[in-house]
Amino acid sequence: MDWHNWHNAYDQNPALKKRLVLVRKHLSRCLDRSAPGEIRIISVCAGDGRDILRTLADHKRRADARAHLVELDPKLVADGRNACAALELLSNIDFMNEDATDPRSYRGAAPANVVMMCGMLGLVDLAELPNVVRAMQALCAHNGHVVWTRRLDWRNGVQHMKALQKLMLQAGFTQATLSVTSFGALLSKTRKPSFAVGTHRFGGEPIALPESERLFTISHQSIE
């Protein structure tokens, strides 16, 4: 899968643009709710970081934010770093060209006040969701927030979302906001995709990151 080209679709595709707007709104609310002082942000499978970068650029808490973005694709990382420079965010952002499933990618950054897990849940199988939620517990600070997305009309999305919500509740997360929206054609002209964008608050205490074993396994390499 050419993820660099896939992300370019955000510039032309109305459905992706609308989803991005929702994600930015959820992130902005998390920043608004954050206590005074430093706001630590982690993004898992960050892409080019356009959800975080533009939100921070325009937000009143910009100076407080310290974001740690993890992305494996070097082209997307290069684009993200260039965007950081253009938005004068280099002092706020660490853009890491690393494997998001490797716990070593988050050393020194976790636990964070805001954890972004957007665009990656459709790449993991249902049986892998408990590991994803454990990763959330390791990455998120007490009273922090996790922002996540899931496409619902694809790969048993509704079933996955309900399973995720149940697992998160059992792990100490409470749902703060959920947006479920149906858009026009995404990449296929034969069906109308729908998306969930959720924010959960973590009321528990963060668990330790594993020493070396993968946080979770990505089983799919395409979104269509």
Placement of each model-derived feature along the sequence:
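A short SAM/SAH-binding and catalytic strip from SAM-dependent methyltransferases
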Residues: 112-128
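A short glycine-rich, Lys/Arg-flanked "PGG" loop and its adjoining helix->strand segment in the class I
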Residues: 129-142
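Class I SAM-dependent methyltransferase Rossmann-like catalytic core
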Residues: 1-36
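Conserved beta-strand signature within the Rossmann-like core of class I S-adenosyl-L-methionine
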Residues: 140-152
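Class I S-adenosyl-L-methionine
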Residues: 158-160, 165-224
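Conserved SAM-binding loop of SAM-dependent methyltransferases across substrates and taxa
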Residues: 48-63
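Conserved SAM/SAH-binding beta-strand->alpha-helix loop
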Residues: 73-75
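Conserved SAM-binding loop
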Residues: 80-81
